[in-house]
């Protein structure tokens, strides 16, 4: 499968939008490869000696390193360029998504109200959104993950996938495989006889890491949970557009509400770095509660 598969729910840039996105990607690449790469030398030859001169010892914590680095104009310049690049990336993506917003909402309705739906969507109108998710525009995504503008709104999910594709392209992540496909390959190599019949993807976001498990384990009942309604609507429509049946639910990773010992495979893909320490611990306990005897928990992340 292509690393970023083309499907009807994926926004399509016009010529000028694509040119702006490619420029932004080049800028972010330059900052990463040529500006950020000098931070180690900046610390060793300027920031650390300045700290030693003032305190008579080397920095002993991340906080002390941060303090002395933040005082350096070169690091301030890098930080400004790094944030500007991220803001420019989202602005370039927004041009395409706001132009396509009505079309995406209409396609969401078309796919999810079809008599040929393979999966389902369960949203909770009384869901108590975690403040850590609702009060912050995570990764500077406009509106954050939890923005919701109505019953047919899929904008947060569209931002997540389209912006994420551009971001990971610049970092060389998953050039030939998606996170989900890497997870499938790991399972097949590590547990060649493992054939899960019920699978749960925690923090499934737009469903791009969930769908590969439907392809790999065609007889499995695949579920995905997340807290954000707009992202889940997008995930549902995306899966249906690709002809894949996934059951999406608006639920909390720390308290999923599923029955004990009800899944063979419980997993997540780059979700835990968005969780608090307490949520991560609760999620791990929930894993053990949900797993059938002989089941597998698999979590990949950057932290």
Which residues are covered by each model-predicted region?
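A short glycine-rich, Lys/Arg-flanked "PGG" loop and its adjoining helix->strand segment in the class I
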Residues: 281-293
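N-terminal auxiliary segments of SAM/dcSAM-dependent transferases
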Residues: 5-20, 24, 28, 60-151
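Class I SAM-dependent methyltransferase SAM/SAH-binding core
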Residues: 200, 210-255
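Conserved beta-strand signature within the Rossmann-like core of class I S-adenosyl-L-methionine
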Residues: 294-301
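A short acidic, Gly/Pro-enriched loop at the edge of an enzyme's catalytic core
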Residues: 254-266
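A short SAM/SAH-binding and catalytic strip from SAM-dependent methyltransferases
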Residues: 265-278
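Conserved alpha-helix/loop element of class I SAM-dependent methyltransferases that forms part
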Residues: 173-195
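Conserved class I S-adenosyl-L-methionine
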Residues: 195-205
């Amino acid at each position: 499968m292509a690393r970023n598969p083309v499907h009807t729910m994926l926004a399509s840039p016009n010529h000028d939008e694509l040119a702006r996105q490619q420029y932004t990607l080049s800028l972010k690449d330059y900052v990463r490869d040529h500006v950020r790469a000098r931070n180690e030398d900046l610390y060793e030859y300027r920031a650390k000696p300045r700290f030693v001169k003032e305190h008579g010892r080397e920095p002993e914590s991340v906080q002390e390193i941060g303090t002395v680095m933040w005082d350096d104009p070169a690091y301030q310049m890098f930080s400004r360029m790094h944030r500007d690049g991220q803001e420019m990336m989202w602005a370039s993506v927004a041009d395409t998504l706001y132009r396509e917003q009505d079309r995406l909402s209409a396609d969401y309705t078309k796919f999810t109200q079809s008599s040929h739906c393979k999966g389902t969507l369960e949203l909770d109108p009384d869901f108590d959104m975690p403040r850590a998710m609702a009060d912050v525009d995570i990764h500077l995504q406009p509106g954050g993950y939890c923005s919701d503008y109505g019953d047919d709104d899929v904008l947060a999910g569209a931002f997540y996938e389209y912006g994420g594709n551009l971001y990971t392209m610049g970092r060389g992540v998953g050039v030939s495989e998606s996170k989900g496909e890497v997870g499938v390959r790991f399972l097949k190599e590590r547990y060649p006889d493992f054939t899960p019949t019920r699978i749960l993807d925690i923090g499934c976001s737009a469903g791009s890491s969930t769908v590969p498990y439907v392809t790999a384990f065609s007889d499995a009942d695949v579920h995905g949970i997340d807290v954000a309604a707009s992202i889940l609507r997008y995930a549902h429509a995306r899966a249906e557009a690709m002809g894949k049946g996934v059951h999406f639910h608006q639920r909390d990773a720390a308290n999923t509400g599923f029955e004990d010992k009800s899944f063979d495979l419980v997993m997540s893909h780059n979700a835990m770095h968005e969780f608090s320490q307490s949520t991560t611990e609760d999620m791990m306990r929930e894993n053990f509660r949900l797993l059938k005897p002989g089941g597998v928990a698999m979590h990949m992340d950057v932290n």
